[in-house]
C-alpha cells in the first residue's frame, strides 16, 4: 500500500512539473512514471534491481529517441526525484547502468534538462 501511495505521489508530481512545460515531446510524465513504477522500491530501499524495473528503463530509453523526448523524460525524472524525499540519489544516478542502458545525462535532482541532446 505504501508503494502505491509513493507511486501516486510520483505520478502527481510529474504531472505538475510537466504541465506548464511547452514542448514538442511525445512523451508524457505519466508514460515515464508508468515505465519506472517497478523501480520505486529499488530507488527508496535496499535490494537488487527488479527485472520489471530494467524492462521499464529499456522501454523508456527506446521511446525517447528525439531531443525533445529526451529532455521531457529528463524533466519528468528530475521532478520525480525531487518529489520523493526518500529516493537514494546514488541509486537513481546508477539505475540506467545497472539495467545496461546508456542515457546521455545523469539522473539527479539538479540535472539541467535543457542541455540534454
Swiss-Prot record:
Coiled-coil boundaries: none
Keyword Transport attached: yes
InterPro entries: Bifun_inhib/LTP/seed_sf, Bifunc_inhib/LTP/seed_store, Plant_nsLTP
Leader sequence segment: 1-25
GTP-binding recorded as keyword: no
Gene Ontology MF annotations: lipid binding
Keyword vocabulary terms for this entry: Disulfide bond, Lipid-binding, Signal, Transport
Disulfide-linked positions: 29-76, 39-53, 54-99, 74-113
Single Gene Ontology BP annotation: lipid transport
Entry superkingdom: Eukaryota
Cited function: Plant non-specific lipid-transfer proteins transfer phospholipids as well as galactolipids across membranes. May play a role in wax or cutin deposition in the cell walls of expanding epidermal cells and certain secretory tissues.
Family in the record: Belongs to the plant LTP family.
PANTHER family: NON-SPECIFIC LIPID-TRANSFER PROTEIN 2-RELATED (PTHR33076)
Stated name of the protein: Non-specific lipid-transfer protein 3
Protein's organism: Brassica napus
Gene name, Swiss-Prot/TrEMBL: LTP3
Amino acid at each position: 500500500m505504501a508503494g502505491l501511495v509513493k507511486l501516486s505521489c510520483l505520478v502527481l508530481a510529474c504531472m505538475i512539473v510537466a504541465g506548464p512545460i511547452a514542448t514538442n515531446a511525445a512523451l508524457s510524465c505519466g508514460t515515464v512514471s508508468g515505465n519506472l513504477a517497478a523501480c520505486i522500491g529499488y530507488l527508496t530501499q535496499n535490494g537488487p534491481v527488479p527485472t520489471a524495473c530494467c524492462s521499464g528503463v529499456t522501454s523508456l530509453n527506446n521511446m525517447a529517441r528525439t531531443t525533445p523526448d529526451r529532455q521531457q523524460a529528463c524533466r519528468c525524472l528530475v521532478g520525480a526525484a525531487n518529489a520523493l524525499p526518500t529516493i537514494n540519489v546514488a541509486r537513481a544516478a546508477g539505475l540506467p547502468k545497472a539495467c545496461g542502458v546508456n542515457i546521455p545525462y545523469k539522473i539527479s535532482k539538479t540535472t539541467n534538462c535543457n542541455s540534454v541532446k
